[in-house]
């Protein structure tokens, strides 16, 4: 009678357990063969490694050929969850050692097919595709599925050991604490993928932003006029093409000086973050590039008065916001010529100053001195010696000038070579780190020559020369598609020294991808 009661009790326990589970399990036996693993058997039988170990009282993953394993196939209750991370990698197996199949965007709905003991879940997504993800990155978790699996497997062992009913009750409550883990993941921030701009935070990279917003690295660099992948904390990055269009300053400058393309192609690409630059041209460009997208369209009517400038005039009165490069572009001349016409020793201007913008630059004092000394020699000698000595002096003067220019270029290149191997930093002015135009400005300054701070402004302030005319010490410019964005110091034989992502180094201007971006050469 006692045995009958025990049997009834066991049966009742099984019935209660089966009722609590979402589905009914069926048991089978598998014989381990050479090369088999618990994970492989679990996959082929629609169960989990944890379930196999519990059903067979295994304390490790080790199995041997010929070993018989009790397998319980469980049709789990499928649970719908959503990806709580920004992007979640789907792998071919339950662990980071397995290959990535794809990545799911935050908020994507998935169905959990099974839960592994290591916290990974087998999921289905899309149209019947399956894979494995880390369960802590799934929100809205329902824990009934793993409870059902454990209960049903104990029900299988209960047929041979009624006392196992007590174990079932204990295990039924064991998975419950896993629920808060899923709930915690709900607090993970979900990125607004509809945003058009992103403010850079610590740890951000161009690649991470491209993944986060579904844009390619090339697009992000193009939309933001970046010549390298370097970004800095606090920088506002356009992550949609629409933001790039409204933020670009090109149209605003173009209407202001429609006849000159140089100013149009002078966006501050890498250097517009340098707050220490005092050149007015840099300040003006920075102001344009930091406007909010909603305001960028407003300045369009402002340049309307630009056509009132008489570009045929020989003088110009400096106005607020003017710079030498801007004035030079407006009148189709160069910064160096305006400085020579007005005896300027720096690029600084004052509002109200009247500048000569047309005319002939007077010859240098060196030539005049040479000419005046010739008659003096003639006076002190007879005609024969006079004729002989005069060309001798002229020849010496020209030779000295050539040597001086050569020496100046050699000194400039020697200064550039001192910094080979130094690190690149966006906005770097030296002497420990540089960006491209910071490097050229620093090197030329060491030779007593003042250059504008940005590559675009340097392009506008130099005289155009062909590659066949280029000599060591000239500047070489590059355009990635949005205006002048890079500058280096030409050293001859198709080589330049420049500051780029890999630091200060030599580069072939026609090799390693540089050739297709080469714009031309400029002489200071």
From Swiss-Prot:
Quick one: signal sequence residues?
1-27
Q: Where is the LysM domain?
A: 28-71, 196-239, 314-357
Q: Report the InterPro entries cross-referenced here.
A: LysM_dom (IPR018392), LysM_dom_sf (IPR036779), NLP_P60_dom (IPR000064), Papain-like_cys_pep_sf (IPR038765), Peptidase_C40 (IPR051202), SH3-like_bac-type (IPR003646)
Q: Which GO terms describe its molecular function?
A: cysteine-type peptidase activity
Keyword Transmembrane set for record: no
- Which CDD domains does the entry mention? LysM
* PROSITE patterns given in the database record: LYSM, NLPC_P60, SH3B
Q: Where is this region: Disordered?
A: 150-188, 272-313, 360-408
Q: Which residues form the SH3b domain?
A: 78-142
> E.C. number, please?
3.4.-.-
Q: Which UniProt keywords apply?
A: Hydrolase, Protease, Repeat, Signal, Thiol protease
Active site annotated at which positions? 436, 486, 498
GO terms, biological process: proteolysis
Q: Name one Pfam family in it.
A: NLPC_P60
Role according to the record: This major extracellular protein may be involved in the invasion of non-professional phagocytic cells by Listeria.
Q: What is known of its domains?
A: LysM domains are thought to be involved in peptidoglycan binding.
Output this protein's name.
Probable endopeptidase p60
